[in-house]
Design a protein with these regions (language model features):
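Phosphate-handling catalytic cores of nucleic-acid transaction enzymes
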Residues: 1-4
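Positively charged interface segments
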Residues: 7-77
């Protein structure tokens, strides 16, 4: 379930154009956004250490999708 929450969070970033969070935020700002996401969806909040490990795993999976969406948004503006 913990992995699924991080998966949903990163998919939410991709779908809702929150790319600045990934590329321009510090780790603690990114974690604050995750806490906000968990509170919105009533998920339990995991410790930042666990979050960091899972995000490293998932960011490699979604990196190209995030990057492509990010540059597409910049070009459109």
């Amino acid at each position: 379930m913990t992995k699924n929450i991080v998966d949903l969070f990163l998919l939410d970033i991709i779908e809702n154009h929150y790319n600045d969070i990934v590329y321009k935020s510090t780790a603690s700002q990114f974690y604050k956004q995750f806490i906000h996401f968990c509170n919105l969806h009533e998920f339990n909040i995991m410790p930042i250490q666990t979050f960091g490990i899972l995000v490293k795993q998932y960011k490699s999976i979604y990196y190209h999708r995030l990057r492509n969406r990010y540059f597409t948004v910049i070009i459109q503006h």
